[in-house]
Amino acid sequence: NFALLAIPFFILAGNIMNQGGIAERLINLAKVLGGRLPGSLAHVNIMANMLFGAISGSAVASAAAVGGTMAPMQKKEGYDPAFSAAVNISSCPSGLLIPPSNTLIVFSLVSGGTSIAALFLAGYIPGLLMGLSLMVVTGIIAKRRGYPVSPKPSCAQIWDTTVKALPSLLLVILIMGGIIGGIF
């Protein structure tokens, strides 16, 4: 079945991206975008899981890539390791909702042919709401525990980080545009 072939290829793409440094570029972009919030590294973890899940389609690949990079950074900044693990584990399932999602592909097959493109379009809002709600809860906990806030980045840092992460973000647009447009 051609639809089932997408699953191992999404996982392979996630592993290749992790080894190629895309996860690190996405984490740096998330740092620039959300680094000024209380518990900034926890917010970076959530945003990076959402971005990486949107590229790889796999929550497991997202958890491994982002968690392996973020856990040492959070420990160095004084975050409780249990809190860091909880944030990573609770935010990686957003990769199951934000397309392309392996779970939505399997659901399409099991349900008797529900349109994968329609499922992918329906996954964006719940995935984003899940990420935003996790960020609210994380912000409250981080403020109570007194976790650090990163300094405000300069415009040059924002530009440089965005330019470096742009190919990663264009990959999401290419994959989703191809699937929704019927090219893939």
Q: What residues fall within each predicted segment?
A:
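Alpha-helical transmembrane segments of multi-pass membrane transport proteins
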Residues: 1-184
